[in-house]
Amino acid sequence: HSFIWLKEAGVALPVYCVQEPQVPLLLSKATNLFKLFLSDVGLLAAMYADGLQIRILNKENNINFGSVYENAVAQELCAHGFEVYYFNNKKQGELDFVIEFEGEALPLEVKSGKDYTKHRALNHVLESPNYHIQNAIVFCNENIEVKDQIFYCPIYMAGFLEKRTVPELSLIHI
């Protein structure tokens, strides 16, 4: 019940696991498996060890920003109205996020280091004939780049993903 309270209070963002990255994602949602992100990445940074904030402002490069970046992406996706999930499979690995985008499952990976092109789980899912996934996005510390089915984008671009809805049908009465 504590997790539900945190969600209802607007403090936390639950991201549920899906058993397969196929639309509709809701049908394969595992209600007992989820990750919990903070609704404000500033809260996460404040909870870290003393002095980390100064090290971040000083642009020290020996800090693992993975959890901060992943939290920031989760926050942006939720703010833009996406139902956010993640995928975890023993054989294929874990995808940080999966959303429905333009009627398809879109895997999203968040990478904070220089090895942003290494993503075993993402490669497995893209190569799987079972999932029919066309594209994926990797948010990283680099410039925009496209390699095959993967779009590499700077972390801040997570804020530019927009949920598109089907336009409403307008009935004309004669």
Residue ranges and their predicted role:
Residues D40, I150-G159:
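Helix N-cap / beta->alpha transition motif
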Residues S112-C153:
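Catalytic cores of nucleic-acid endonucleases
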Residues I172-I174:
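Conserved small/polar residues in nucleotide/adenosyl-binding loops
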Residues A105, V166-S170:
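N-terminal cap/leader regions of alpha/beta-hydrolase-fold enzymes
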Residues Y86, P107-V110:
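Short catalytic-loop micro-motif centered on adjacent basic/acidic residues
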Residues H1-E102:
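Accessory nucleic acid-recognition modules appended to NTPase machines
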Residues I144-V146, M157-P167:
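A short acidic, often aromatic-flanked loop/helix-cap motif at beta-alpha or helix-coil junctions
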Residues E104-L106, N135:
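Structural motif
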